[in-house]
């Protein structure tokens, strides 16, 4: 059986590194698929553990010039510690490089002919390259040994050439002056390029860390220590890792629930909003379930640990979000192929630029050839391309997780905004999925209290799902009964009882007709009116007359009307599928402003209906409970599972809405639209940046206006390109998931069609 694991990667500096690691792992025997996420500094590997081990994977990555943190070596906290240490190290190097490169820049630009100026610049430049910029050269050499090239290669070659040329001219300036030429010095270019690229990576690192805040928030929901109750009743504080299934744990007011389990003692209220999205605390008594990361309110209670570690709902959510953030949108596959050849192509362009200037550069051919080739190497930026898609995906999926929208992969996130039709299962999706009594019309002149007790006696013995709603309604009214009698279930009709020699009936109209019981005209009118509203009418009668009409309905979810309005306002066709008859289905459609519905649909017909819409050329999303609708969910282009708490069907659909609020669907659509827009913007600017700046760096404008781009300006532009891409992606975090509705001219009644 294949395994899928996520590993933290050490040593990546650009998108080219990610491409090299992905290629190395993909070529390893036993690896099914490898996906490297440069933005998250991790890799998700699906592999056959009988053919390749974690150590083998680590060795493969090490041979490519990088390293992996194995699963047993890294907890999320450890990876975060490493990221913090790397950031602090980069921060120190950046400050040092900026301080030392500043005097080099000032002398090189404004006091280039001052006495001993070249030697002073050499003294400041050496530590910039050999101390603060040494990792560029080490990584470039390591990549060269493995036959690869990356962003560090471009930096090392460009600054190395500029420095060595300047060093030669400092030591032997007469080589040029004897030939009537000036011995040009480019220490400022080498030093400032290193400093600016370090500054760019520092800003990029800070921005990238913000894309992972959703994961850090989820991880932070689990406490580090718990209180375990020993067999003798004493309390013991233990680390969360030591908790085993079967342990009895104590939760005090304000504590976070450490693992999933069931209450064994005590009563309290728990804030489960992070799981269910519902703001109202849930009462917990003996036997009820509690979930990791939820927050206890006022009371204390004990519970038995049932699911720990990776088995908890919180762990499943974290794993799903991590895998989704590491997944790749279809457009990223093209970007990966470009990134893999980008650095070699840039080196080739730089070489051609050098040769071209040497051939046609005139008196200053060598100087211009060196300057332009170095500028080409410096300005080219595969990082902007490599970060364009994954940063937007990470932020988008993280934003979804914060809004109770769990998105399983990048493809679903990208596809959702293209959806043209949304198919909703009525029960449990549009409605609460739990029938309730909305009205009881009692026949005047009867003994109301006795009749209610008889009704409770009969319904409390019935196994029909609607009977539970009647029992709940009567008990909430304070009705109790000690009546005794006979009880009989009548298939397809209802139930019959005998109490104190009197026959009573609860059921449908057919039950009345079979026993010769007629309805009064007013009762018939009430029943017909309720049926037209899509409600179910249950009759309660004795042997002579109808005692009451019990009206039962499956309540609409509070946000259903608004959610459907929002989707239809965006031009999305919304279809309701239901097993109800046409009259009931039409009434439901009218009540929520739905334009399209299909009645009398069997569960097996739902997938066929989705297929029909797809055959019409529509991109279809299906929303259901994730279990009964699994076939239709599998058929849909985008599958959405509605659920909450322990009912979350994470593995069923591509998108799982933890909250039961239907408004999460248009929210998810808006999030998809924002993310795809950010991806397109990022890719556009990344491609335009390279397409325009590389020719500029090569000196394409020199023949017409004498313009040559300074390598230092090129370094600043390169750093800015990466930072701007990440910053643009982070705009998704700042945006609220809002909707603009310009034409909300809905006719809630009569504006529908049956399909």
Give, region by region, the residue ranges found by the protein language model:
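Actuator/coupling domain of P-type ATPases
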Residues: 62-80, 118-121, 125-225, 241-249, ...
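Signature of the cytosolic headpiece of P-type E1-E2 ATPases
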Residues: 101, 466, 475-587, 602
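Conserved ATP-binding TGD loop and adjacent catalytic N/P-domain core of P-type ATPases
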Residues: 2, 19, 407, 499-501, ...
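Flexible metal-binding regulatory segments at protein termini and peripheral loops
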Residues: 1-116, 217, 232-237, 315, ...
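Conserved cytosolic catalytic loops of P-type ATPases
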Residues: 29-51, 55, 187, 216-311, ...
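Conserved cytosolic catalytic headpiece of P-type ATPases
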Residues: 1, 37, 233, 282-289, ...
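Membrane-embedded alpha-helical bundles of multi-pass transporters
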Residues: 110-113, 145, 164, 399, ...
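Bilayer-spanning, highly hydrophobic alpha-helical transmembrane segments
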Residues: 94-104, 333-361, 372-381, 386-391, ...
């Amino acid at each position: 059986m294949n395994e899928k694991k996520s590993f933290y990667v050490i040593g990546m500096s650009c998108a080219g590194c990610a491409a090299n690691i992905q290629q190395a792992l993909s070529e390893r025997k036993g690896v099914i698929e490898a996906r490297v996420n440069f933005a998250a500094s991790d890799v998700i590997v699906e592999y056959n553990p009988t053919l390749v081990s974690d150590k083998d994977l680590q060795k493969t990555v090490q041979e490519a010039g990088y390293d992996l943190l194995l699963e047993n070596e890294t907890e999320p906290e450890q990876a975060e510690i490493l990221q913090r240490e790397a950031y602090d190290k980069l921060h120190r190097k950046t400050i040092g490089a900026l301080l030392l490169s500043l005097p080099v820049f000032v002398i090189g630009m404004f006091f280039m002919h001052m006495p001993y100026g070249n030697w002073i610049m050499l003294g400041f430049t050496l530590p910039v390259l050999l101390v603060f910029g040494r990792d560029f050269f080490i990584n470039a050499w390591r990549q060269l040994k493995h036959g690869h090239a990356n962003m560090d290669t471009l930096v090392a070659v460009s600054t190395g050439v500029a420095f060595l040329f300047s060093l030669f001219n400092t030591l032997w300036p007469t080589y040029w002056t004897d030939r009537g030429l000036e011995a040009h010095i480019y220490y400022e270019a080498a030093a400032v390029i290193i400093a600016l690229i370090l500054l760019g990576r520092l800003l990029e690192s800070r921005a990238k860390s913000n894309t992972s805040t959703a994961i850090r928030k989820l991880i932070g929901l689990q406490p580090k220590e718990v209180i375990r109750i020993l067999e003798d009743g004493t309390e013991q504080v233990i680390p969360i890792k030591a908790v085993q299934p079967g342990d009895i744990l104590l939760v005090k007011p304000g504590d976070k629930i450490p693992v999933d389990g069931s209450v064994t003692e005590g009563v309290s209220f728990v804030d489960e909003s992070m799981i269910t999205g519902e703001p109202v605390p849930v009462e917990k008594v003996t036997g009820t379930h509690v979930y990791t990361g939820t927050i206890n309110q006022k009371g204390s209670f004990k519970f038995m640990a049932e699911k720990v570690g990776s088995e908890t709902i919180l762990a499943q959510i974290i794993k799903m979000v991590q895998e989704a953030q590491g997944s790749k949108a279809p457009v990223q596959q093209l970007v990966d192929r470009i990134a893999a050849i980008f650095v070699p192509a840039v080196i080739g362009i730089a070489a051609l630029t050098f040769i071209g200037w040497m051939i046609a550069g005139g008196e200053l051919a060598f100087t211009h050839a060196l300057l332009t080739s170095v500028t080409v190497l410096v300005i080219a930026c595969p990082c902007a391309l490599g970060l364009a898609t994954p940063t937007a995906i990470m932020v988008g999926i993280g934003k979804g997780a914060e809004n109770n929208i769990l998105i399983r992969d990048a493809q679903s996130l990208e596809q959702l905004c293209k959806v043209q039709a949304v198919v909703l299962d009525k029960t449990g999706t549009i409605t609460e999925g739990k029938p309730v009594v909305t009205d009881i019309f009692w026949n005047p002149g009867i003994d109301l209290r006795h009749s209610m007790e008889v009704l409770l006696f009969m319904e409390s013995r019935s196994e029909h799902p609607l009977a539970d709603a009647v029992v709940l309604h009567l008990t909430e009214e304070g009705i109790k009964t000690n009546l005794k009698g006979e009880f009989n279930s009548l298939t397809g009709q209802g139930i019959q009882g005998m109490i104190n020699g009197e026959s009573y009936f609860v059921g449908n109209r057919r039950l009345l007709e079979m026993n010769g019981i007629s309805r009064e005209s007013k009762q018939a009118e009430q029943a017909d009116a309720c049926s037209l509203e899509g409600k179910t009418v249950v009759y309660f009668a004795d042997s002579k007359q109808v005692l009451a009409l019990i009206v039962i309905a499956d309540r609409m979810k509070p946000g259903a009307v608004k959610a459907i309005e929002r989707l239809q306002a965006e031009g999305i066709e919304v279809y309701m599928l239901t097993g109800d008859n046409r009259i009931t289905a039409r009434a439901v459609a009218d009540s929520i402003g739905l334009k399209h519905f299909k009645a009398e649909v069997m569960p097996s017909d739902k997938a066929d209906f989705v297929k029909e819409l797809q055959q019409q050329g529509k991109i279809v999303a299906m929303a259901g409970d994730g279990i009964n609708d699994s076939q239709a969910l599998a058929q849909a282009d985008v599958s959405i599972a509605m659920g909450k708490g322990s009912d979350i069907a994470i593995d069923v659909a591509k998108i799982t809405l933890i909250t039961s609020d239907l408004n999460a669907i248009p929210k998810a659509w808006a999030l998809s639209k924002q993310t795809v827009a950010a991806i397109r913007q990022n890719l556009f600017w990344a491609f335009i940046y390279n397409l325009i700046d590389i020719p500029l760096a090569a000196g394409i404008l020199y023949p017409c206006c004498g313009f040559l781009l300074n390598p230092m300006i090129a370094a600043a532009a390169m750093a800015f390109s990466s930072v701007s891409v990440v910053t643009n992606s982070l705009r998704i975090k700042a945006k609220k998931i809002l909707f603009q509705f310009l034409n909300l001219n809905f006719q809630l009644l009569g504006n529908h069609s049956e399909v």
